[in-house]
Regions:
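Predominantly flavin-linked oxidoreductase catalytic cores and closely associated redox partners
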Residues: 51-187
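A conserved beta-strand/loop capping segment in the N-terminal third of enzymes
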Residues: 2-48
Length: 187
């Protein structure tokens, strides 16, 4: 619960012809505190996951991966080459670390995936902004998320308004092959 900003219980989906479908979890599951769509901020989730990993024995390193050696037949053990910024200096110290397993949790344009030549895969690209609304408008989104479908917001994805801590996240996305089309929607 500590990472969840809002417990959304209502979803509105809006079609290209402006037809709306409203989904209420209360109508589906009855009024309960256990059924909701949890909204959280990425940085809060990341911090939670880092802290949880440390609690379970992981050694945290403030570093930037620069190269990954994948071992025989790309099956490991893996050698991470990285710049260690633990000292707080602006120039990291070059280090290596041998590991049995790598979890790349660094997003769609993953340095980790590129460094170990993970191959081509379909990637969705998202653009999102945080917008602070006046209290009245923010109250409207208290437990409501909206999704918009149609080529006016994305050729193959959707647009959204998701309520977060003290703002709404407004965004859209597309598959990487269409990113030039979606960039035309940016202001």
């Amino acid at each position: 619960d500590s990472i969840i900003d809002r417990k959304v219980r209502n979803m509105r989906m809006i079609s290209p012809s402006n037809r709306e479908v409203n989904i209420s979890l209360d109508k589906v599951y009855g009024k309960t505190d256990n059924e909701y769509i949890g909204m959280c901020r990425r940085e809060v989730m990341d911090a939670f996951m880092r802290n949880r990993a440390a609690e379970l024995g992981a050694n945290l390193v403030n570093g930037l991966v620069t190269k990954i050696e994948t071992g025989n037949n790309r099956q490991g053990p893996y050698t991470l080459n990285y710049s260690d910024y633990s000292s707080g200096e602006s120039k990291g110290e070059s280090k290596t670390l041998e590991v049995d397993l790598i979890i790349g949790a660094d997003g769609a344009n993953s340095r980790v995936a590129k460094a170990m030549d993970a191959g081509d895969y379909n990637v969705a690209i998202a653009f999102q902004e945080r917008i602070k609304l006046p209290e009245k408008e923010m109250n409207y989104y208290e437990d409501l998320a909206e999704m918009y479908v149609g080529t006016d917001v994305s050729p193959d994805f959707y647009g959204w308004v998701f309520p977060k801590y003290d703002h709404v996240a407004v965004g859209t996305g597309t598959m990487q092959k269409n990113q030039s089309l979606i960039k035309g929607l940016q202001v």
